[in-house]
């Protein structure tokens, strides 16, 4: 079985800085994503990038994942915002939805209505003042990461529109920690009405994607493989 990702459908226009890279690369040998409907979310990690980071982002976008999560949450807020102003136009150029991470005020300031929030942050915002709640209502996509059924149910109550559940397979990102596995993923998928994306140890492997799909996942997230393109 062969696979390709599709676009989530959320888009926006960034005015002003229109930094676009023009690297021409052959990614076909790296991607098992041609001609299918199983969505793959690319997750960034500049520490793993095989090329200069913006160059790497363009390589990822040329592969046309369903979306790119700009995860660089260890950056200071101002540095993250600066990076986002560079990444968003690249995503727009390739018609790839960009989901910003953690810094929701900056996302709104940049006109991006897709955000991924750590669950503790989503929890605190949901219990915050009315102004914060009104601002969160400006997002069309609100994702969060979960590691249990209870967390998935909580995320749904708090207004998340998707969850990333993991880690599903063995991964270097979670060294020494046993994967939660496909049974866990299946249970999460059955427990919530939200789209659930598997994360952790996911590769460009159609057989693996079939396992995720059979467990009920709406798609999968790939970090390391995307940063190695």
Task: Give the positions of each predicted feature.
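Short amphipathic alpha-helix with an adjacent loop that forms part of the alpha/beta core around
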Residues: 131-134
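Glycine-rich phosphate-binding active-site loops on the catalytic face of alpha/beta enzymes
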Residues: 119-127, 164-176, 204, 209-229
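Serine residues within intrinsically disordered or low-complexity segments
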Residues: 2-5, 11
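Charged helix-capping and loop-helix junction motifs
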Residues: 81-85, 177-185
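Conserved N-terminal beta1-alpha1 strand-loop-helix module at the mouth
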Residues: 10-122, 136-161, 203-206, 227-229
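Glycine-rich adenosine-cofactor-binding loop
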Residues: 181, 196-205
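Small side chains
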Residues: 42, 67, 198, 219-220
